[in-house]
Amino acid sequence: KFALDVVFNPKTTEWKLSYDGRNKEPVTLPVKFPLLLAQGVEGIAVGLSSKILPHNFNELCDASINYLRGEEFQLYPDFQTGGSIDVAKYNDGERGGAVKVRAKINKLDNKTLAITEIPYGKTTSSVIDSILKAVDKGKIKIRKVDDNTAANVEILVHLAPGTSSDKTIDALYAFTDCEVSISPNCCVIDDSKPHFLTVSKVLKKSADNTLDLLKQELEIKKGEILESLHFASLEKIFIEERIYKDKEFEQSKDMDAACAHIDERLTPYYPTFIREVTKEDILKLMEIKMGRILKFNSDKADELIAKMKEEIAEIDNHLAHIVDYTVNWYQMLKNKYGKNFPRHTELRNFDTIEAAKVVEANEKLYINREEGFIGTTLKKDEFVACCSDIDDVIIFFRDGKYIVTPVADKKFVGKNVLYVNVFKKNDKRTIY
């Protein structure tokens, strides 16, 4: 139903012959809605890759209405998979912007987390795989993962004993596909050329196109009613004046003579007609069957003509106020289908998660003071502290110098080490 309302209309479609010339096919479909923004799209080309994120149906309708009224509007992505999104750097979908999308993670109890919504572009399998990889690398500690997904997403994450659920949630966002960053790039074909536009610009072009298509539809409908009105007026005069019973008509020697007689009889009424009477009109009058003539009712004919004139006046009013007509059309669309498209993705501002604070201490740091090496593989040497593979190490030497260096399997730092430990960034309490 939506496609019939919005996408398909043979009367406003530009057609061309198919490859074999036997059928017609559309050059483009006359779409009266920003489907590109509603569905999103992704494509690749050398230097012209495109990634347009999907948006909410109701918000697109509201934005189109606001634009037509000359009011401001803002559009932000909305995903069927739900989750939450940080649009601080969305940049109206233009190249160079970025959004962060997170899964929805709930605490069922102190030992179990439930992922019920996943980020856009991910599947339950890819999310689970990313969690298991993070476990293998020692980034997070969990006991097992269960996939109970059916009609709705449900991934259960069972925590290891003694593991903080809050810290694990942050770690899932930091090290797995529970949080992803997406870089939109609104590259579209406009006027047969690629252009990098904003989402707002695309919506404005769509709204203008919708207005033009609705105007075309009104003009086509008006033309059809005018044709019906023209023939109804001809038919009424032809039957009421009993032109079909004229002696000259009945005794016409050929079709041309009959047409000439009808044309002559209609001549006094020409000023009342909408357009010039053609031979095709006269031939159509001659095709009226006797049964229709016998059942003809003048009052009903007058009612029909009056009704068609009212419809034409109404269409003329719509054409004179085409912006208001387009606004009402978008409002009709929203009222008819909007309840089926609630917003699924929550708009939020995400706090930055520092990986070093949520990663599990999955390694042990050692030092060989005599040879000047530190690392996680020097298990026979002096133990320093537990650490993770993304931590930094701070080292002070006896001459007063110090260095900060990443944790490594084995690294030469120098002899005469006075102090060594895991370096905590933004630690304002420790004095060296």
Label every model-predicted segment.
Residues F2-V6, P10-K11, W15, L29, ...:
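C-terminal interaction appendages of subunits in large macromolecular complexes
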Residues E14-R22:
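Short, surface-exposed recognition loops or helix-turn segments adjacent to catalytic cores
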